[in-house]
Amino acid sequence: MSVEVTKLASGLTVVTDTMPHLETAALGVWAGVGGRDERPEEHGISHLIEHMAFKGTTRRSAREIVEEIEAVGGDLNAGTSTETTAYYARVMKADVPLALDVLSDILANPSFAPDELEREKNVIVQEIGASQDTPDDIVFEHLNELCYPDQPIGRSLLGTAKTLKRFDRDMLRHYLATHYRAPDMVVAAAGAVDHRHVVAEVAQRFASFDGGLAPKPQAATFGNGGGRVVHRDLEQAHLTLGLEGVPQADPSLFSLQVFTNALGGGMSSRLFQEVREKRG
């Protein structure tokens, strides 16, 4: 079987899917931390740290981080979600060690330079403004707030201008140290990779990550219902309906996913055919 899994002594998990016929590899680091791990005063810090990871380390400048990967024809990116933050790269097989070195460097040695931090805060404030000009974003932001009121899982990932203003280098370092723990991290690689080589590289380059456990996020509690209407000067109305689902480990989850696709998952779905095709 091409998929292999190894758990290091620190608790960090390494997963590979070897595809010998390929000449390239995709690899990344997934940390089990996201928006739902934030306290009210930390709202938006997970996403900010993801941005700041590319803004320089104690070994590389922001420019050197991207140039080292792009100089060998690769690309580098990241993303934050409610429950995870991912940092990933795609490179030729000979450059897998380089990619792992860069990924480990931006997480283990970020400089969080004050001037870069202030600049990136402003970038995210602009993101917030753009989101507020996008009806699709607005409607789901309000839906999440209603489904999970007064909970981190119900808040937007971007934070607010007020919370962003408070963040400084020490706050980012503390959050990184307490939430980016080896037992809650996975390094995954697929393509032209050798499992033993990847494990050896990861064991060396990610050795500085603490083996302790990160704080547990607040348990989610579904809201008591209700609705909200937000008026904007637009030509279309955007509607959402949220219902409580089942836990991820529930056996009926797969049936629910089939139902979701049948209802609105594609052009042949019930809602697509009824709303768009029949009613325009």
Indicate where each model-derived feature is located.
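Short beta-strand-initiation
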Residues: 1, 224-227
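Short, Gly/Pro- and small/polar-rich lid/capping loops
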Residues: 1-10
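Charge-rich, well-structured scaffold segments of protease-associated domains
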Residues: 7, 15-18, 62-217, 229-230, ...
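Active/ligand-binding-proximal structured segments within catalytic/core domains
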Residues: 11, 18-69, 180, 251-263, ...
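Short proline/glycine- and acidic-rich turn/helix-capping motifs at secondary-structure junctions
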Residues: 217-225
